[in-house]
Amino acid sequence: MSHSQEKIALITGASSQGDIGTAICRKLASQGIHIFFTHWNSDTAWIEEFQQEILRMGVRCEAMKIDLSDAHAAFTIHEKISDKLGYPSILINNAAHSASDNYVSLDAKSLDEHYAVNMRSNFLLCVEFARRFKKSNLISGRIINMTSGQDLGPLPGELAYAATKGAISAFTRSLSQELAPLGITVNAVNPGPTDSTWMTDEIRNFLSPKFPMGRIGTPDDAARMIAFLASDEAEWITGQIIHSEGGFIRG
């Protein structure tokens, strides 16, 4: 990605102080990248405060509250970012829907809810990004999706989540081939279990012994990997599912 090219990043799912999306916004802003983030079910006062925090880093920042389960969300988001900041050269699909279900509880409603956010929204954001990128004067771009290690082992009790996240890996690999001629790299990151807003003390105590490095991953760990993939140095990396989870031991 050319250093003379103004960089604008679109990040979905930055909805609370301690989540991965928020850490990604901070990391990219610290590198001089303008930020557009989406959120949902967030405290309005916190969103405004966080936006001001990013602005104090010397970059532009816009936020948008949107329900990604809406079939028109991808188009709406790209229209808004183009109007407010310009064409993004970086897309990070961080938002996800997750609800526990097993063979007893899984139903059409749960499948549809997971599909709408984890697959449809993600995929449409990617292709809308690429279509607009092709019409722009941007030289190279980055798409970074998020997976959950479903390639490395089973996730019992998370059937819809595991299936829809697994689809992201397949989509990432295929899309990378299509977009390579445009100068867009497409990768996915599995950050492993991350000590963010979802993790309770019970879960934390259960997972801690499974990390040989002596600690659970943090949102900043994920943000550093994503920032690297969004950088100029990662221009030769595409079609990869990167497991950045501190040697996490499954089973």
Curated annotation (Swiss-Prot):
Keywords: Oxidoreductase. Substrate binds at S148. Belongs to the short-chain dehydrogenases/reductases (SDR) family. CDD domains: SDR_c (cd05233). The keyword Chaperone does not apply. Its EC number is 1.-.-.-. The keyword tRNA processing does not apply. This is Uncharacterized oxidoreductase YjdA. The active site is at Y161 (proton acceptor). Pfam families: adh_short_C2. It is an enzyme of class 1 (oxidoreductase). It comes from the Bacteria. NADP(+) binds at T12, G13, A14, S15, S16, Q17, G18, D19, I20, G21. InterPro entries: NAD(P)-bd_dom_sf (IPR036291), Sc_DH/Rdtase_CS (IPR020904), SDR_fam (IPR002347). PANTHER family: NADPH-DEPENDENT ALDEHYDE REDUCTASE-LIKE PROTEIN, CHLOROPLASTIC-RELATED, RE15974P. GO terms for molecular function: oxidoreductase activity, acting on CH-OH group of donors.
